[in-house]
């Protein structure tokens, strides 16, 4: 079904924002209770997570400015999550605040959360619930003309694959 979002973090706030903007992304919303922003262009959602003491902050401290998580659209997130666990995936718990969606996630490479999202319709998406859109800002900016993400890689460090294959 595709990608819902890519989550980024940096140990130094202010590092990634100008890069997103140069690429044509606009900040369109802020999280209701966390130091997290939503950048968007076309149907591409980038989450910039600057929340202290979060999985994202620990990931950024270890890896530097980087992708610290990603979300995939699925028909039924709980069913997909349970199936992933049956196949050996490791669950990962993400702290949620009041009035915030609990997003099922499994542990990806380097501990990056891989979220499974089944709420992506206009008006009931995780952005409509967890974020506040900025006044006077287009919610779906055209930006530089990028429309969707069709693929990306989830790379491993050289020689780390031996630890994963047993």
Ranges and model annotations:
Residues 162-166:
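Conserved small/polar residues in nucleotide/adenosyl-binding loops
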Residues 114-161:
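Acyltransferase donor/substrate-recognition loop-hinge adjacent to the catalytic core
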């Amino acid at each position: 079904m595709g990608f819902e979002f890519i989550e980024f973090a940096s140990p130094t706030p202010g590092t990634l924002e100008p890069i997103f903007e140069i690429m044509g992304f606009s900040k369109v919303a802020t999280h209701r209770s966390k130091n997290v922003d939503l950048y968007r262009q076309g149907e591409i959602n980038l989450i910039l997570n600057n929340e202290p003491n979060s999985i994202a902050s620990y990931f950024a401290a270890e890896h530097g400015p980087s992708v610290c998580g990603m979300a995939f659209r699925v028909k039924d997130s709980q069913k997909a999550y349970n199936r992933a666990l049956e196949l050996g995936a490791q669950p990962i718990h993400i702290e949620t605040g009041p009035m915030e969606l609990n997003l099922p996630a499994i542990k990806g490479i380097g501990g990056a959360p891989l979220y499974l999202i089944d709420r992506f319709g206009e008006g009931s998406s995780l952005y409509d619930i967890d974020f506040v859109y900025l006044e006077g800002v287009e919610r779906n900016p055209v930006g530089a003309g990028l429309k969707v993400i069709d693929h990306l890689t989830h790379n491993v460090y050289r020689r780390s694959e031996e630890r994963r294959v047993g």
